[in-house]
From Swiss-Prot:
Function: Confers resistance to chloramphenicol.
PROSITE patterns per record: MFS
Source organism (scientific name): Escherichia fergusonii (strain ATCC 35469 / DSM 13698 / CCUG 18766 / IAM 14443 / JCM 21226 / LMG 7866 / NBRC 102419 / NCTC 12128 / CDC 0568-73)
Record-given protein name: Multidrug resistance protein MdtL
Membrane topology: Multi-pass membrane protein
UniProt key word Phosphoprotein: no
Alphabetized PANTHER family for the sequence: CHLORAMPHENICOL EFFLUX PUMP RV0191, PURINE EFFLUX PUMP PBUE
Regions crossing the membrane: 4-24, 42-62, 69-89, 93-113, 131-151, 158-178, 203-222, 245-265, 269-289, 293-313, 324-346, 363-383
Compartments it resides in: Cell inner membrane
Family designation: Belongs to the major facilitator superfamily. DHA1 family. MdtL (TC 2.A.1.2.22) subfamily.
One GO process term, biological-process aspect: response to antibiotic
Xref: InterPro entries: MFS, MFS_dom, MFS_Efflux_Transporters, MFS_trans_sf, Multidrug-R_MdtL
Entry keyword annotation includes Cytoplasm: no
Domain of life of the source: Bacteria
Length: 391
């Protein structure tokens, strides 16, 4: 079992590493490529676009051909794209490399969640996804620090060679450690079960909405945090870094505590708690009379996301034993596109950073609480269905 957990964690971590590690080198990258930092900030959106594009096909391929045939090319593409970015001499080539990086990371991301659905029952999967969420929270803190240390001695290209090295490690794990987990193709008598695994299932769609709104909350916070903390609240760059590190610490602590909470409380209780914390955060930020109260509201955001996201993802994947790859892809596409659409629309309409965050917090909490309370599984979700794995 440990091999599946290690491989799943490694496959997922390419996604945040690809986002966060290069940011510290952005000024030098812009200077070398004769582009402005503003022009290269689109590299974030291009990377997410690559991930979304990968998710359009990766899940279906993973369900038909297996998890390894998607993970291995995905890791290989991430390696090639990282090297391509390091060799880019124009901003256009650099952005093309970032898109390819996103494609590779997206393939690996989809496979990771499909593997966890294949190998874990509902309760254990919720615990593992909460732990995975905690580990993922470490990356936005550690990746820029690692990038800074690398750039003390080496040029910005070394950041992408470091990413390529990470990709090589994931590729080796996928080749030699990961075993295929895709369930055997269903017999004719099992076709009704396959047909029941519909993406239009009300319970699944409700969890897609909940997780998409939750991701929109956390990405809105990350995206607006420089404006909120430095421009509006007046913190210095060093203080901003410290606050973000502390918020990551809150996320990690809560994420690592959630598996223990699942041994005491029902998953539904934790999901409700998550959304109540979002609502409390939105109200706190809306009426906050001081920076200290605002910072408390920000910690509520991190705690709320960490308590509920892993549980919601586990519930979303629960009904799918034969189509876990497609379900994982659908979740990923909805989360990436939904959150990006919200941030883009808010910017186009001219909603300020503060109101953007408050708005998504309150909307997410109200909609999600209604879905949690009124949309329940239409049939009992099997704790775990024994599967015959392909060699």
């Amino acid at each position: 079992m440990s091999r599946f957990l290690i491989c799943s964690f490694a496959l997922v971590l390419l996604y945040p590493a690809g986002i966060d590690m290069y940011l510290v080198g952005l000024p030098r990258i812009a200077a070398d490529l004769n582009a402005s930092e503003a022009q290269l900030h689109i590299a974030f959106s291009v990377y997410l676009a690559g991930m979304a594009a990968a998710m359009l096909f990766a899940g279906k391929v993973a369900d038909r051909s297996g998890r390894k045939p998607v993970a291995i090319p995905g890791a290989a593409l991430f390696i090639i794209a990282s090297v391509f970015c390091s060799l880019a001499e124009t901003s256009t080539l650099f952005l093309a490399g970032r898109f390819l990086q996103g494609l590779g990371a997206g393939c690996c991301y989809v496979v990771a969640f499909a593997i966890l659905r294949d190998t874990l029952d509902d309760r254990r999967r919720a615990k593992v996804l909460s732990l995975l969420n905690g580990i993922t929270c470490i990356i936005p803190v550690l990746a820029p620090v690692l990038g800074h240390l690398i750039m003390l001695k080496f040029p910005w290209q070394s950041l992408f060679w470091a990413m390529a090295t990470m990709g090589i490690a994931v590729l080796m794990l996928s080749l030699f450690i990961l075993k295929e987990t895709r369930p055997a193709a269903p017999a004719a008598s099992d076709k009704p079960r396959e047909n029941r695994e519909s993406l239009l299932n009300r319970f699944f769609l409700s969890r897609v909405v909940i997780t998409t709104l939750s991701v929109s909350v956390i990405l809105t916070f990350v995206n607006t945090s420089p404006v909120l903390l430095m421009e509006i609240m007046g913190f210095e760059r060093g203080e901003y870094a410290t606050i973000m590190a502390l918020t990551a610490g809150v996320s990690m602590t809560v994420s690592f505590s959630t598996p223990f909470a699942l041994g005491i409380f029902k998953p539904r209780t934790l999901m409700i708690t998550s959304q109540v914390l979002f609502l409390a955060a939105g109200i706190t930020l809306a009426v906050s009379p001081s920076h200290a109260i605002s910072l408390f509201g920000i910690t509520l955001i991190c705690a709320g996301f960490s308590i509920g996201f892993g549980v919601a993802m586990s519930q979303a994947l629960g009904p799918f034993s034969l189509r876990a790859g497609v379900a994982s892809s659908t979740l990923g596409i909805a989360q990436v596109c939904g959150s990006s659409l919200w941030i883009w629309l808010a910017a186009v309409v001219g909603i300020g950073a503060w109101n953007m965050l408050i708005g998504i917090l309150i909307a997410c909490s109200i909609v999600s609480l209604l879905l949690i309370m009124f949309v329940t599984p239409g049939r009992p979700v099997a704790a775990h269905e024994e599967i015959h794995h392909h060699a």
